[in-house]
């Protein structure tokens, strides 16, 4: 799963979006890889949970100034606990208020590709630069 639930909508990258293509290039299992949209997809939480409850990793971006705990995430939306990645603790987040994520990845997609390879295949390929567990 990708990104977070906001006001009854959960936005995820389309399968043909830049993120969707980078996930494919990273040989990551992305639940919306078969989607043909090149932008973000507005989904209901029910749609996400129906298709993605068994995802291995949940990675998202937010603007906040401090890491989000699992308790804080559940306070925001209790449905997160239905994600297998949540119960296994495979949650990776990048705080875009403290990390130059957009500034760097916009011009260096290879940095983001590397992050996705590590997220999908483990840290045997190195340490994450942007995302934190």
Protein language model features and the residues they cover:
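Short, small-residue-biased leader/transition segments that mark boundaries at the very start
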Residues: 1-5
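Second-shell loop/turn segments in exported
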Residues: 6-13, 33-36, 99-106
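Stable alpha-helical elements in mature extracytoplasmic
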Residues: 15-22, 28, 44, 109-112
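His/Asp/Glu-enriched short active-site or ligand-binding loop at hydrolase and phosphoryl-transfer sites
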Residues: 19-40, 59-62, 93-95
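Extracellular/periplasmic catalytic domains that process cell-envelope and extracellular macromolecules
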Residues: 24, 50-52, 83-87
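Short helices/loops that flank or line small-molecule/ion binding pockets
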Residues: 43-54
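Structured C-terminal subdomain patch of bacterial secreted/periplasmic proteins
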Residues: 60-133
């Amino acid at each position: 799963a990708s990104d977070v639930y906001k006001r009854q909508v959960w936005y995820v990258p389309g399968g043909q979006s830049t993120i969707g293509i980078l996930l494919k290039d990273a040989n990551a299992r992305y639940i919306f890889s078969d989607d043909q949209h090149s932008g973000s997809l507005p989904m209901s939480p029910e749609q996400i949970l129906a298709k993605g409850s068994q995802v291995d990793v949940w990675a998202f971006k937010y603007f906040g100034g401090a890491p989000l705990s699992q308790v804080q995430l559940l306070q925001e939306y209790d449905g997160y606990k239905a994600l297998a990645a949540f119960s296994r603790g495979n949650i990776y987040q990048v705080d875009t208020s403290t990390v130059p994520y957009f500034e760097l990845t916009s011009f260096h997609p290879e940095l983001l590709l590397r992050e996705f390879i590590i997220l999908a295949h483990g840290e045997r390929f190195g340490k994450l630069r942007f995302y934190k567990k």
